[in-house]
Amino acid sequence: MFSTLNARLADVGVETATIGFFSWLGITYSIKVFWAPVVDRLKLPFLDRLLGKRRSWILLAQAGIATGLYLMAHVDATVAPEMMAFCGLLVAFSSATQDVAIDAYRIEVAEERLQAALAATYIFGYRLALLVAGAGALYLAEFWSWQVSYEVMALLVGVGMVTV
């Protein structure tokens, strides 16, 4: 999301200094350690009973990502850069939270001998998603629009939600 967001902001004429400010959204992955204990200990009402603690956090995080991306599709960054930043923060925070929950889920459900293979599979999926969200989003934006691009990315996250 971050590389395509920079391209989108530049494409619509947002000032370079403002685009630089948006790079702070990436810090969420570095500071996820501060809310990881909450994800580790807090059971989400209703969802926990249906899916269990880890899967409920994964689903909530994916809902946050999809919502943030969908909202970003409909925000004009030249008119409301603060709203775009809020949506970006929602995506970044939700993405980092998903990372915490998926790691915890992987550790709990698999035997120790399978951990390396599962971690590698997760990283492969993450890298594939980066490619789709990067090159795929840029391709869609070039041939259709940024709005369509972000809506499709939100829809793809929705597909992932079905697998939880």
Pin down the residues of each PLM region.
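Symmetry-related core transmembrane helices of the 12-TM Major Facilitator Superfamily/SLC fold
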Residues: 59-66, 148-164
